[in-house]
């Protein structure tokens, strides 16, 4: 966790120097069911989107992170809905994960979209030059 926080801090400090000149594209990989991980993901997305206002961010959730985007279970529902309204932030959930958890799109927080495969979504973003951050404990 300390390593993640230190990495984010370095990125934020660097971003202050280059925010206006060099927009970034970052994909966040979230698989944990731990609500502390969900909360730290939201903090990181908020901080980085403020530091890089002209940049793009996508949070990809799969496996154990299903509850992060469920209306009735998420500890960060209000934040997810608020951030998803921004043009430069996307929250996506894996359809395979939804199927395994027997969840349909009506149960998702407003603004969350689904993709066929979370891992492939991350791979595609990386192929397009997006930076990668793994959110974990």
Where are these regions (language model features)?
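Helix-enriched interaction subdomains in cytosolic or periplasmic regions
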Residues: 1-2, 17
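Secreted/extracellular ectodomain signature
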Residues: 20-137
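Sec-dependent signal peptide recognition
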Residues: 2-10
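Hydrophobic h-region of N-terminal signal peptides that target proteins for export
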Residues: 10-18
């Amino acid at each position: 966790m300390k390593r993640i926080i230190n990495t984010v801090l370095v990125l934020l400090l660097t971003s202050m120097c280059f925010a206006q000149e060099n927009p970034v594209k970052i994909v966040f990989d979230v698989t944990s069911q731990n609500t502390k991980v969900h909360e730290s993901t939201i903090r990181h997305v908020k901080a980085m989107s403020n530091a890089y206002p002209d940049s793009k961010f996508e949070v990809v959730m799969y496996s154990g992170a299903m509850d992060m985007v469920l209306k009735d279970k998420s500890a960060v529902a209000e934040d997810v809905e608020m951030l998803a309204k921004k043009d430069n932030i996307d929250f996506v959930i894996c359809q395979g994960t939804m199927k395994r958890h027997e969840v349909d799109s009506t149960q998702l927080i407003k603004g969350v979209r689904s993709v066929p495969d979370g891992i492939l979504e991350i791979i595609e973003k990386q192929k397009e030059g997006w930076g990668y951050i793994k959110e974990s404990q």
